[in-house]
């Protein structure tokens, strides 16, 4: 099967660094992971042949860890340590930096107005979301009750969509996370951190939406 006929979420999980490639082209492989590469490329008016060629090159490299076949308990432990704990570190620091940048550079036209507010909203939403997963959903899945978790999973997926929408607002506010020429060191460091957060959050959501939740619902 050609790559163009496969879902973005599947490609992101099966080809090393495909997620970084999709991020470069601003293609949503986490919340929009069920759309095929061809459809996603058409929506962005991108040349699918070029992207397929880049994916073929990436596919020559061995994948570090194939989470598609990992035990669900191992996936959950990985999500908590690699993503949940990391987001809890990332967001408070980014909020502090955004507060400083918005205050110090308030008179500059390029200042990302409202960024502190949007990062704070994301922090509050994610904190509540991750707590619900860790206290309710993940224990259910680990106990083999994932097939009965349709309700909690649909809520989590809906909250993933909301987080994805906030990321789009943050990208819009920051000129696609591109610092202007006059950006100070804090401003540049903050944008590096936001890019890292977006990468991490998209990988995190993709792992849950495209692997953990479907397998749990299937009764594993």
Swiss-Prot record:
HAMAP family: RIC_YtfE. Disulfide bonds: none annotated. Homodimer. GO terms for biological process: protein repair; response to nitrosative stress; response to oxidative stress. Coiled coil: none annotated. The gene is ytfE. Pfam families: Hemerythrin, ScdA_N. It is found in: Cytoplasm. Belongs to the RIC family. YtfE subfamily. This is Iron-sulfur cluster repair protein YtfE. One of its GO terms (cellular component) is cytoplasm. Di-iron-containing protein involved in the repair of iron-sulfur clusters damaged by oxidative and nitrosative stress conditions. Keywords: Cytoplasm, Iron, Metal-binding, Stress response. It comes from the Bacteria. Its main location: cytoplasm. The keyword Cytoplasm applies. GO terms for molecular function: metal ion binding. PANTHER family: IRON-SULFUR CLUSTER REPAIR PROTEIN YTFE (PTHR36438:SF1).
């Amino acid at each position: 099967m050609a790559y163009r006929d496969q879902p973005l979420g599947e490609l992101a999980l099966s080809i090393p660094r495909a997620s970084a490639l999709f991020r470069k082209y601003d293609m949503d492989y986490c919340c929009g992971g069920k759309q095929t590469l061809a459809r996603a490329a058409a929506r962005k008016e991108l040349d699918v042949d070029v992207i397929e060629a880049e994916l073929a090159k990436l596919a020559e490299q061995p994948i570090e860890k194939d989470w598609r076949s990992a035990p669900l308990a191992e996936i959950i432990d990985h999500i908590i340590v690699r993503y949940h704990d990391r987001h809890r570190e990332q967001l408070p620091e980014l909020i502090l930096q955004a507060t400083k940048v918005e205050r110090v550079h308030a008179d500059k036209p390029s200042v990302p107005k409202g960024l502190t507010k949007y990062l704070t909203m994301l922090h509050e939403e994610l904190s509540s979301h991750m707590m619900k997963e860790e206290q309710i959903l993940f224990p259910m899945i680990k106990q083999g009750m994932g097939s009965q978790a349709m309700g909690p999973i649909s809520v989590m997926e809906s909250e993933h969509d909301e987080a994805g929408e906030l990321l789009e607002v943050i990208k819009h506010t920051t000129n696609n996370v591109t610092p202007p020429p006059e950006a100070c060191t804090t401003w540049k460091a903050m944008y590096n951190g936001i890019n890292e957060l977006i990468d991490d959050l998209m990988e995190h959501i993709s792992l849950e939406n495209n692997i953990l939740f479907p397998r749990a619902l299937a009764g594993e």
